């Protein structure tokens, strides 16, 4: 038997109206039901530059990762700012945010230093954006180093900066064996240190 592709439809009837349920979806083919909201743990999530999208319903959940929604460029950025730059920064911040929220208890010292009420502390956010701008100034460099790798370097940078005991896992790059990444991380540490003063 083939798995249903789920043609989801918002369920609206007298009962859902009476109970004020506005996010219950049901598959018109198999009857699968799904409550789609910010807190739902059974959403099938896809990350996009606009936010996270539930693959069952197509709804975008902007509140799921609030840390990246309100990134405003500095006044000094206005001459160099463009959509690709901000999308890249948002993608990196989203990956860093998801990593530390996923491993929150393993890196509790780090998360206490970089987050406040489920978002980046303003000085950390500013330091990460400034560091990115100073280190990855040219599009050629961004094209040579993947966003995935840059995100991992920022994760390693934050662990190295804020962890009381440095414990890296398989999700963190071992830069000592990679000359280019090692050089980038050294430059990132320098710029992050200068931007957070």
UniProtKB/Swiss-Prot annotation:
Q: Fetch the InterPro entries from UniProt.
A: Herpes_UL92 (IPR004289)
What family does this belong to? Answer: Belongs to the herpesviridae UL92 family.
- Which protein is depicted? Protein U63
Q: State the organism of origin.
A: Elephantid herpesvirus 1 (isolate Asian elephant/Berlin/Kiba/1998)
